[in-house]
UniProtKB/Swiss-Prot annotation:
tRNA processing is among the record's keywords: no
Family from the record: Belongs to the UPF0478 family.
Any one Gene Ontology cellular component term annotated for this protein: plasma membrane
Membrane topology: Single-pass membrane protein
Record's keyword terms, sorted: Cell membrane, Membrane, Transmembrane, Transmembrane helix
Chief localization: membrane
Superkingdom of origin: Bacteria
Region spans: Disordered: 144-168
Transmembrane segments: 7-27
Protein name: UPF0478 protein SH1183
Subcellular location per the Swiss-Prot or TrEMBL entry: Cell membrane
Keyword Cell membrane listed: yes
């Protein structure tokens, strides 16, 4: 039985050696995987740095573009304000024209009879003026001695009447 102990020690040593070899194999495999992961991370780090540079450049461009757009919007606001002012002025002008038109229409409708009388009296005045001119012209001509007031009446056959329609 004395021999069992050394054999058990040898078996334990062999088992320990196999265990160590297994651990070494596993550690070598883990080292290869870690080396591969390290290389992948180095590649990812380079890509992240490139993406970071591109992102920074894009942010700078976006900031410049935003500033440019803000400047243009501010200038455009003054144009829009000017157009709004013109629109307000045109609207005020339209309101004034409407008020004046309504006032004129109202005054015409109130003074319709007076306007009709003025037109009739102006027609009478024009007839009298024409007769006066005809008489004055005849007096100045050589045939004045042959004409009489009766002839003046014969020459007044011209009709100077004017009809005024009341469409107000």
């Amino acid at each position: 039985m004395d021999w069992i102990l050394p054999i058990a020690g040898i078996i334990a040593a062999i088992a320990f050696l196999v265990l160590c070899i297994g651990i070494v194999v596993v550690l070598i495999s883990v080292k290869k995987n870690l080396d591969h992961v390290a290389k992948t991370l180095d590649g990812v780090e380079g890509q992240v740095q490139g993406i970071t540079r591109e992102t920074t450049d894009l942010l700078h461009k976006a900031n410049r573009l935003t500033e440019d757009i803000q400047g243009k919007v501010e200038r455009l606001n003054s144009v829009v304000d000017g157009v709004k002012g013109i629109g307000d002025s045109v609207q005020n002008l339209n309101g004034s024209v409407d008020r004046v038109t309504n006032s004129i229409t109202h005054n015409i409708s109130q003074n319709e009879d007076k306007i009709s009388q003025v037109v009739q009296w102006s027609n009478v005045a024009m007839e009298i003026a024409d007769k006066w001119q005809n008489r004055h012209y005849r007096r100045g001509s050589a045939n004045y001695r042959n004409t009489s007031v009766g002839n003046d009446a014969n020459h007044s056959n011209e009709n100077y009447t004017t009809n005024v329609e009341k469409n107000f």
